[in-house]
């Protein structure tokens, strides 16, 4: 089971794609905790996030508009996690539908996990260049 933390400060234009990529995961043992940072409860960002909370019992939205900074927001969000494993999702991220399924299988087998990303903006390609396969701390 995985708690997904999604702090939001800006990026209203990405919320729908990002949250949809979580709702469409093949692995269904997750919760999504959205932390709104820097926006009051009557803001468009907050209202959009609350709509997802209404649509899915797995999504919870919390108001952190008085907390400054992503790190401080993430630290505050951890108290709301139900599960031992935590994944971080930025508002401009989209996850492959099998991301959690594959990573949870790998984590259960190996006990440690890492990932790679694909840039989908104006710089196409895979970044960063991390070797595929078993890696150690020495590979970084």
What is the meaning of each model-derived region?
Residues 1-140:
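Nucleotide-sugar donor-binding/catalytic module of glycosyltransferases
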